[in-house]
A protein has these predicted regions:
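A short, terminal or domain-edge coil/loop segment
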Residues: 146-148, 163, 168, 190, ...
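Flexible, glycine/small-residue-enriched loop-and-beta-strand segment within the central core
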Residues: 47-50, 54-176, 203, 210-211
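Terminal amphipathic alpha-helical/low-complexity segments used for targeting or macromolecular assembly
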Residues: 1-66, 125, 131, 139-142, ...
């Protein structure tokens, strides 16, 4: 990135951050935290950033500032959000955890907890309705009483490109949702969903294969053609 396009701000530069619509709070022991912001970024809802740790980086790219709250609770966490459209998020990023959101269509309401040494990745063209929750761990430990050892462990969550997540969906650790798939309202995702499938239920199960979606309703032919091309389904 060129210097005139990206601006690096210390988390202590409160007046400059406020010019971008960012309110930042550093808790005791927080230092060397950096926020990167694109010049010309528009703020519609305002963003609260909370640091509790050191050497964290939040990189905000694109035309629109995400709204909501980012809480980085530990050292060496990283957040990269690149969006030209609405993103409203409440994310908790722990020690050496990573949050990556790349050019979504829109995220109207995401609550996420990204545990130490795990990642949450959301690909381009994704559409999230309100009330979506994503966890990369169970938060507490389950112990096998025969061995005295923990049997549940954290795991990454990956949402590939052009995925539609309906309202009030919960996505749990070690889950991957493949390109172009759809997850129905109030579903609970506990593993891998292949590309171009419709899943719903608690736990989520496949309702239909070889499907995808477009944002228009009724569906516009140009959007169908664009979607099919993106999924490499058009014949030459």
């Amino acid at each position: 990135m060129t210097e005139d396009y990206r601006r690096a701000l210390s988390s202590l530069d409160t007046s400059e951050l406020q010019n971008f619509g960012i309110r930042c709070q550093n808790f005791s022991g927080s230092e060397d935290n950096i926020i990167l912001v694109s010049d010309g970024m528009v703020s519609q809802r305002g963003l609260e950033i909370n640091f509790s740790g050191a050497r964290n980086e939040i990189d905000l790219r694109g035309l629109q500032l995400p709204g909501g709250r980012l809480s980085v609770l530990g050292d060496e966490g990283s957040v990269l959000i690149d969006t030209d459209s609405e993103v409203f998020i409440d994310a908790y990023v722990y020690k050496r955890a990573r949050l990556l959101i790349q050019k979504p269509r829109a995220i109207f309401g995401l609550w996420s907890s990204i545990t130490e040494n795990t990642s949450l990745s959301i690909g381009s063209g994704a559409l999230f309705a309100e009330g979506v929750k994503i966890f990369t761990s169970d938060h507490h430990s389950v112990i096998d009483l025969n061995t005295g050892k923990q049997i549940n462990f954290p795991g990454d969550v990956t949402i590939e490109n052009d995925v539609w997540i309906a309202s009030d969906v919960t996505i749990l650790k070690n889950s991957t949702i493949g390109k172009g798939s759809v997850v129905g309202a109030r579903a609970v995702v506990t593993g891998s969903i292949p590309s171009m499938e419709l899943w719903s239920g608690h736990p989520a199960r496949c309702l239909k294969q070889h499907v995808s979606w477009v944002p228009s309703h009724p569906a516009e032919p140009a959007q169908i053609e664009h979607m099919m091309a993106g999924l490499n389904l058009l014949s030459n």
